[in-house]
């Protein structure tokens, strides 16, 4: 444990969308001489990623309430009280100078416990529409960080910081001019794949004239990669299909444009990499937050928002033809995306935490 006044507690759990930006901030805290501890839950991805990062992980018992049965709802108040008490015990033991929450089920009880212990609480919202826990914690927070403008109501607590993303994504890729080569299309569905995109892209690309058709690199997910490769073969479209892309910075550096979902980190990474995109938001995302994320890039002209319900192969092919026949349009979109990036997001969030911690 670090010396008094040098501990920080980060709360993030459940999915990579919460955990990865929190890990970026953890590394920044460590670079400034702070000892970082992590508060999570037993079932989230943090149980794999946080120990890999060499950070101590503290667990509390809490889970979501959406879609649960009546018995779970009746037990909920007692479960939450127990989780708050568990978090309070951990905070009292660690004596952190501040608590930084990134969302997930752990953030609610942890945020309440921070307030009960008199430790400054800072929350960070990755999506353009705030999650339930972060919305409820605003009154208890010393500062409220948002990745996208106007996610929270205007107040002296609010700071628009952007999403912490990997610094290597901000490197300028050296690409030959599009006039001298075929365009390159990167298709992403998340680490598990997005089956609607896996079905849509081969059909859409088969409707693009062969002379205009881009090179294709498609992340299809472990379970769907073989059938996706077969779909491309049957459609007569050459494509490299992989279950998972380990080096996203390299993939972004290769691509000229991207077709993908609109998770908060993906949208922020597209801006960091300066990549035009066609965004197909996950239609059943909680509070439709992916559509709101996509609108951030689409409103400024850095992306096309293409709702899944109204986007078939013909519609996607038409959009692809439009940009492939106008390489200068891709260049303009790329520049717009890069201007929307927030390269200082990680250091800004950490600055805010230390400001409230030390005055």
UniProtKB/Swiss-Prot annotation:
Q: Which residues bind UDP-N-acetyl-alpha-D-glucosamine?
A: 15-17, 127, 166, 191, 245, 264-269, 290
- The first-level EC class reads transferase
Q: Name one Pfam family in it.
A: Glyco_tran_28_C
Show the disulfide pairing: none
Which transformation does this protein catalyse, written as a reaction? di-trans,octa-cis-undecaprenyl diphospho-N-acetyl-alpha-D-muramoyl-L-alanyl-D-glutamyl-meso-2,6-diaminopimeloyl-D-alanyl-D-alanine + UDP-N-acetyl-alpha-D-glucosamine = di-trans,octa-cis-undecaprenyl diphospho-[N-acetyl-alpha-D-glucosaminyl-(1->4)]-N-acetyl-alpha-D-muramoyl-L-alanyl-D-glutamyl-meso-2,6-diaminopimeloyl-D-alanyl-D-alanine + UDP + H(+)
Q: What is its EC number?
A: 2.4.1.227
Which pathway features in its UniProt record? Cell wall biogenesis; peptidoglycan biosynthesis
| Location within or outside the cell | Cell inner membrane
Alphabetized, the UniProt keywords read: Cell cycle, Cell division, Cell inner membrane, Cell membrane, Cell shape, Cell wall biogenesis/degradation, Glycosyltransferase, Membrane, Peptidoglycan synthesis, Transferase
Signal sequence region: none
Which family would the database say this protein is a member of?
Belongs to the glycosyltransferase 28 family. MurG subfamily.
Q: What is this protein called?
A: UDP-N-acetylglucosamine--N-acetylmuramyl-(pentapeptide) pyrophosphoryl-undecaprenol N-acetylglucosamine transferase
Which lineage?
Bacteria, Pseudomonadati, Pseudomonadota, Gammaproteobacteria, Pseudomonadales
């Amino acid at each position: 444990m670090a010396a008094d006044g040098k501990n920080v507690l980060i709360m993030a759990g459940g999915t990579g969308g919460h955990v990865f930006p929190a890990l970026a901030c953890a590394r920044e805290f460590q670079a400034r001489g702070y000892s970082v501890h992590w508060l999570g839950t037993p079932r989230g991805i943090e149980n794999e990623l946080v120990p890999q990062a060499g950070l101590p992980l503290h667990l509390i018992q809490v889970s979501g309430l959406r879609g649960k049965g009546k018995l779970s709802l009746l037990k909920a108040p007692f479960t939450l009280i127990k989780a708050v008490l568990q978090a309070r015990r951990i905070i009292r033991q660690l004596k952190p100078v501040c608590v930084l929450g990134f969302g997930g089920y752990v953030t609610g009880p942890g945020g309440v416990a921070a307030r009960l212990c008199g430790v400054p609480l800072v929350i960070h919202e990755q999506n353009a529409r705030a999650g339930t826990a972060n919305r409820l914690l605003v009154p208890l927070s010393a500062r409220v960080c948002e990745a996208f403008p106007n996610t929270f109501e205007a107040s002296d607590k609010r700071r628009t910081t952007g999403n912490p993303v990997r610094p290597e994504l901000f490197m300028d890729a050296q690409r030959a001019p599009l006039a001298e080569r075929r365009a390159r299309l990167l298709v992403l569905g998340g680490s598990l794949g997005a089956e609607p995109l896996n079905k849509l892209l081969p059909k859409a690309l088969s409707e693009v004239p062969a002379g205009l058709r881009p090179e294709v690199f498609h992340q299809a997910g472990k379970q769907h990669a073989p059938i996706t490769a077969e779909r491309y073969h049957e459609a007569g479209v050459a494509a490299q299909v992989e279950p998972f892309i380990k080096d996203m910075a390299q993939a972004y550096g290769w691509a000229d444009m991207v077709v993908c979902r609109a998770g908060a980190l993906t949208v922020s990474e597209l801006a960091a990499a300066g990549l035009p995109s066609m965004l197909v938001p996950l239609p059943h995302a909680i509070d439709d937050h992916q559509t709101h994320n996509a609108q951030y890039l689409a409103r400024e002209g850095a992306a096309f928002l293409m709702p899944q319900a109204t986007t078939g192969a013909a519609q996607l092919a038409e959009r692809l033809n439009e940009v492939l026949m106008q390489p200068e349009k891709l260049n303009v979109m790329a520049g717009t995306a890069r201007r929307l990036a927030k390269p200082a997001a990680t250091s800004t969030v950490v600055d805010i935490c230390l400001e409230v911690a030390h005055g």
